[in-house]
């Protein structure tokens, strides 16, 4: 009897969303729980959105600032129908990982690297912006529970605006207008600066970030293509030996983050961001050709694809 009831529950869950994972599969949010016990449960906090930044200007840079870039900012333009004269700055990380704050001049700072995720990151962030619009200058925006249904960032951000990222050496921009920061802010600033890995955004291609972590160097490239399509293309290049960015580089795997893949190359010690510019542009051309190839994968390419798939890590 219990088994029959369980099957009914599973069938009902899949009937609500035919594209949802099987109830017994891991939830795609990365919690480690089964889908039926996480975002697939009847009392789930919010529908899980696999690609929450899709449709925003600079989708891949949003992902980079949330997941892999320690210190960076970008100015945000809101839609004309959002009733405010305040400007918004997106920050990778704010002091004490705050969701947001309103500066003394009224500027809203929105933090991307936070400790909560209620299923739709875009909705979570929009809730912070909306609360900030009602907050007096000089106050932080505290973390709260599930914001519930409401506007997403796509409803607030001007779709025709840009999203120009500025990468910083550290987090001193937090206190650029403070003569002598002290207390919790100073301690948080010191800890954040100590942990920040040197990072540079390449200029010749989009959303590729060179970084040095300890004595190792990497290039992490957030790409907007569907995961399956990109994996096929990378497999074609790998089988031909065309997935390198020149001598001293090696494609070692990829991250899965917010609905897209982030291929990662390990680099020799002497390879800087500047020396990667030309090889990265050449690789982008090869990748475009591989993405346009719709033929079936060869045996070698299927083997390469399996290897690449086994070297993925979900970080959302």
Predicted regions and their residues:
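Internal, hydrophobic cores of structured domains that mediate oligomerization or house catalytic pockets
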Residues: 104-217
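Short, Φ-rich (hydrophobic/aromatic) sequence segments
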Residues: 59-69, 116-121, 127-130, 234-236, ...
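Generic recognition of long tandem-repeat/solenoid scaffolds
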Residues: 89-92, 108-112, 219-221, 263-265
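Amphipathic, interaction-prone secondary-structure segments
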Residues: 78-107, 207, 243-244
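A contiguous, surface-oriented mixed alpha/beta subdomain in the mid-to-C-terminal portion of proteins
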Residues: 170-280, 287, 294
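Short glycine-rich, low-complexity/disordered patches
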Residues: 138-151, 165, 203-205, 244-255, ...
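C-terminal structured domains
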Residues: 3-8, 37, 256-258, 264-316
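Acidic/negatively charged segments and metal-coordination signatures
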Residues: 1-82, 91
């Amino acid at each position: 009897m219990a088994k029959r009831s369980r099957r009914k529950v599973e069938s009902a869950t899949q009937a609500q969303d035919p594209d949802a994972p099987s109830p017994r599969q891991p939830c795609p949010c990365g919690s480690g729980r089964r889908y039926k016990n996480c975002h697939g449960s009847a009392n789930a906090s919010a529908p899980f959105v696999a690609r929450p930044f899709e449709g925003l200007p600079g989708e891949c840079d949003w992902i980079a600032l949330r997941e892999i870039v320690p210190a960076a900012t970008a100015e945000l333009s809101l839609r004309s129908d959002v009733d405010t004269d305040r400007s918004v700055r997106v920050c990778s990380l704010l002091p004490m990982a705050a969701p947001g704050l309103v500066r003394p001049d009224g500027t809203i700072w929105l933090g991307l690297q936070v400790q909560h995720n209620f299923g739709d990151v875009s909705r979570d962030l929009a809730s912070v912006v909306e609360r900030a619009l009602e907050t007096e200058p000089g106050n932080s925006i505290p973390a709260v529970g599930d914001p519930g249904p409401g506007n997403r960032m796509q409803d607030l951000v001007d779709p025709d605006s840009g999203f120009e990222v500025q990468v910083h050496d550290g987090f001193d921009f937090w206190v650029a207008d403070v003569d002598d920061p002290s207390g919790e802010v100073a301690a948080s600033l010191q800890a954040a600066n100590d942990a920040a890995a040197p990072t540079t955004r390449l200029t010749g291609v989009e959303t590729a970030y060179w970084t040095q972590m300890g004595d190792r160097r990497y290039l992490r490239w957030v790409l907007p293509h569907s995961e399956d399509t990109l994996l096929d293309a990378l497999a074609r290049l790998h089988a031909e030996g065309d997935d390198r960015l020149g001598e001293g580089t090696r494609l070692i795997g990829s991250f899965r983050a917010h609905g897209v893949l982030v291929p990662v190359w390990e680099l020799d010690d002497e390879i800087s961001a500047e020396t990667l510019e030309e090889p990265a542009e050449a690789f982008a051309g090869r990748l475009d050709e591989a993405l346009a190839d719709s033929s079936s994968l060869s045996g070698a390419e299927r083997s390469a694809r399996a290897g690449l798939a086994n070297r993925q890590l979900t970080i959302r």
